[in-house]
Amino acid sequence: LLYVFAAENELLRASALRELLAAEGLEVDVRERATGFRLAMDELVWEVRRVRASDLTRELGPRLRGAPAGVVTALRQVEVGFAIPPEPHGARVTIAIARLTGGLVHARGAWSRVSDAGLERVE
């Protein structure tokens, strides 16, 4: 289960993101950031930190359909922070995030490209 945290004014866009991740086979629960909800250490947190005015469904939809993750242009409209949970779900979630961000994920304070070998730091 992927928990998405968003400020009140970002909930609609976070819900659009939930629909896209659901299409990747990921169960998503959108929560308002101010709820004080606490997670177990092994659960993924995807926090929507900033979303620009563009609609996520319009921006992400066409890029997801049929495009290899590494070819999809990195989306500047969305900045996210997350922690990757342990297997078996960590790899699936990382791949789904990579599809949404053009093959790049932000983890442990750095951008990394997702490949078959794992995460490769991008300088």
Question: What kind of feature is each model-predicted range?
Answer:
Residues 1, 14-27, 85-123:
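Acidic, proline/glycine-rich low-complexity IDRs
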Residues 2-6:
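Short Lys/Arg-enriched alpha/beta "domain-start" segment
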Residues 12-85:
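Short, intrinsically disordered low-complexity segments
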